Amino acid sequence: MHDRLISGTEKPEDHFDRAIRPTSLADYIGQPVVREQMEIFIGAARGRGEALDHTLIFGPPGLGKTTLANIIAREMGGNLKSTSGPVLERAGDLAAMLTNLEEGDVLFIDEIHRLSPVIEEILYPAMEDYQLDIMIGEGPAARSIKLDLPPFTLVAATTRAGLLTSPLRDRFGIVQRLEFYSVEDLTHIVTRSANLMNVPMTSTGAAEVARRSRGTPRIANRLLRRVRDYAQVKGTGEVTHDMAQRALDMLNVDKDGLDTLDRRYLSMLLERFDGGPAGVEALAAAMAEDSGTLEDVIEPYLIQQGYVMRTARGRIATNMAYLQFGLTPPEPKN
C-alpha cells in the first residue's frame, strides 16, 4: 500500500490531531445538515432523559466520523467506549464491552462493515431490547441466559455502507452521511488548527492548504504540519500563501490536490489507452499496481472530482482530465 501524504486513511502521526479535534457540536465546522440534525436529536433525547437512538455514520476516510462519535458521547454526558469491527473476533469480546457499559454510555464501533456474522447476531438483541444473550456451558448441557443491559447508544462508522447487512443497517434509528468539505470550511479548520498549534498563518496561506486537501480535514491537518515545517526551515515560520504554495509544490501536491500517483494514473489512461475505455485490470498491469489499489486508493477522488468516469466498458477520461494535462479533449463521437 502506498504511504501517500494525501490519503484519507489514518496514519500513526495523525494521532496528534486528537488534541485539536472539536469536542462539541458548537465547535464542529462543516457538515451543516448533519450538525443541525444531531443538535435536534441529541437535545430531544437529553430532554426526555433517554439514550440517543443508535447512530450510523458513513462516508470516505478522514471526514470526522470518530470525531463526531466523541462529540455525541460528550453532548449526551456519557462515557465513550471504542473498538472496531476487525478487533471483535469472539463473542466474548463484545459481551465484555456490553456488560461494562453504564446507562447513557456510547459504544463506538469503527469499520462496522467488518464485523463477523456471529458478532452481528449478538448485537441485534442488544440494540433492540438492551439484552445480551449468552451461552453458558458446552454441548448438551449448554444453556442460554439473558442479561439486561443499561440503555446505551451504539455509534458505528464505516467507509463501506453498502457492505452492511440489511438487518444491521435497519437497526440504526439515525443514519448520517458525511460529505467532502468545501474549501471555505476547510480554510476555517486549517485556521483553527494553526491557532491551536501556535503556527502563525495568513488567511491566504490557510486557503492554499485547504484548496489542496481534497475536501478532507485529516489531509488538511497533515498538510498543515508539513507546511509548518517548511516555513520554519525555509522562512520566518509564518505560513503565507507563497510559503504554502512552495511547500506543497515540493511535496508534489498540486493546486487541485492531485499527487504523483493520481497524475500517473491519468497520464496512463490518456496516453497508453487514448482516454479509454480501459479495464481496471489492464490499467493496473500498465501501472504495475494491483487493481485493488486503483479501486480503493486512486480512483474514488478522481471519479468524485470528475476526472474519470467508471462505465460498464471500463474507465474513461473526461474533458477535465485532458485539460489537466494541457491536452485538447477529443471531439464527441456521433
Swiss-Prot record:
It comes from the Bacteria. GO terms for cellular component: cytoplasm; Holliday junction resolvase complex. Keywords: ATP-binding, Cytoplasm, DNA damage, DNA recombination, DNA repair, DNA-binding, Hydrolase, Nucleotide-binding. Its EC number is 3.6.4.-. Residues 1-181 are annotated as: Large ATPase domain (RuvB-L). Residues 182-252 are annotated as: Small ATPAse domain (RuvB-S). Residues 255-334 are annotated as: Head domain (RuvB-H). It catalyses: ATP + H2O = ADP + phosphate + H(+). ATP binds at residues 20-21, 62, 65-67, 128-130, 171, 181, 218. GO terms for molecular function: ATP binding; ATP hydrolysis activity; four-way junction DNA binding; four-way junction helicase activity. It is found in: Cytoplasm. InterPro entries: AAA+_ATPase, AAA_lid_4, DNA_helicase_Holl-junc_RuvB, P-loop_NTPase, RuvB-like_N, RuvB_C, WH-like_DNA-bd_sf, WH_DNA-bd_sf. SUPFAM superfamilies: P-loop containing nucleoside triphosphate hydrolases, Winged helix' DNA-binding domain. The RuvA-RuvB-RuvC complex processes Holliday junction (HJ) DNA during genetic recombination and DNA repair, while the RuvA-RuvB complex plays an important role in the rescue of blocked DNA replication forks via replication fork reversal (RFR). RuvA specifically binds to HJ cruciform DNA, conferring on it an open structure. The RuvB hexamer acts as an ATP-dependent pump, pulling dsDNA into and through the RuvAB complex. RuvB forms 2 homohexamers on either side of HJ DNA bound by 1 or 2 RuvA tetramers; 4 subunits per hexamer contact DNA at a time. Belongs to the RuvB family. HAMAP family: DNA_HJ_migration_RuvB. This is Holliday junction branch migration complex subunit RuvB. It comes from Acinetobacter baylyi (strain ATCC 33305 / BD413 / ADP1). The lineage of its organism: Bacteria, Pseudomonadati, Pseudomonadota, Gammaproteobacteria, Moraxellales.
